[in-house]
């Protein structure tokens, strides 16, 4: 099958044209897409609608085991009854726009912070795939930042200082930053994990910063200095020259590599407009 890749940014991101992904089954075709992910880190399709079962099937064909340990799973079953299909929306189980004080909505607001999916579990997330089902009539973009280019742009002294450090990641921390509180039982399920601050990508050998708002501290440093370092690195890594903003349209499908990027949702009036997307994320295992 023939795929065409059109770069959308000087460092990363490409728009893909070619066959419907529901029809992509051959190992060679899937390998071609994975090679493109190694190069671009974010791939964008337009006019690529999915039914839920089709998206789940493709995600498993593309990269295997799916992540199902989201913060919303701790708050209760999602409206699809399958935690491997993350409900990225402002819609409740009755099909209504969520109330302003709905805990799921309040938790999801933290997605406006820069993050990488599932860095707070072991194994973490590898590829995330987001399918646009209902898009508001106003901009409600997702921004992506290239962590490989951000690493490349660091000076040699900073690289040497940070390359062997580790950060503790917890989704409870990133939610608490914005005032969301989990109860004791919920916190027990969200203890978090330690991740390297810098990762080496296995197929390319490129290095990338591994950052997220979930990162609460640097394990090897005192908490104040570690948090200041994390803030400085996120500020560096999200400079405009490293960022691509995706304007969503119904039928868009975007895959990104969580080892190579961070992303964040941009705000819109979620009390006036519906926004429904479905996300699948694979686990970073061999």
Residue positions per predicted region:
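Fe(II)/2-oxoglutarate oxygenase catalytic core
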Residues: 2-255, 259-286
């Amino acid at each position: 099958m023939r795929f065409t890749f059109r770069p959308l940014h000087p460092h990363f991101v490409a728009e893909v044209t070619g066959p419907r992904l529901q029809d992509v089954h051959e190992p060679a075709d899937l390998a071609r897409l994975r090679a493109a992910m190694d190069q671009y880190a974010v791939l964008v399709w337009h006019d690529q609608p999915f039914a839920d079962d089709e998206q789940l099937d493709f995600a498993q064909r593309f990269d295997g085991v799916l992540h199902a340990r989201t913060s919303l799973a701790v708050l209760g079953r999602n409206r699809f009854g399958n935690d491997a299909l993350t409900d990225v929306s402002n819609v409740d189980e009755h099909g209504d726009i969520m109330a302003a004080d709905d805990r799921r909505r309040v938790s999801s607001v933290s997605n406006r912070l820069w993050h990488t999916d599932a860095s707070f579990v072991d194994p973490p997330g590898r590829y995330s795939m987001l399918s646009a089902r209902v898009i508001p009539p106003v901009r409600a973009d997702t921004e992506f930042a290239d962590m490989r280019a951000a690493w490349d742009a660091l000076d040699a002294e900073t690289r040497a200082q940070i390359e062997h450090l580790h950060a503790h990641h917890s989704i409870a921390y990133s939610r608490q930053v914005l005032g969301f509180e989990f109860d004791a039982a919920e916190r027990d399920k969200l203890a978090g994990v330690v991740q390297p601050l810098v990762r080496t990508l296995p197929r390319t050998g490129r290095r990338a910063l591994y950052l997220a708002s979930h990162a609460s501290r640097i394990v090897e440093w005192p908490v104040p200095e570690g948090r200041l370092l994390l803030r400085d690195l996120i500020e560096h890594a999200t400079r405009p020259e490293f960022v691509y903003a995706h304007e969503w349209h119904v039928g868009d499908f975007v895959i990104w590599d969580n080892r190579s990027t961070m992303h964040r949702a941009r705000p819109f009036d979620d009390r006036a407009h519906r926004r429904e997307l479905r996300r699948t994320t694979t686990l970073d295992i061999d």
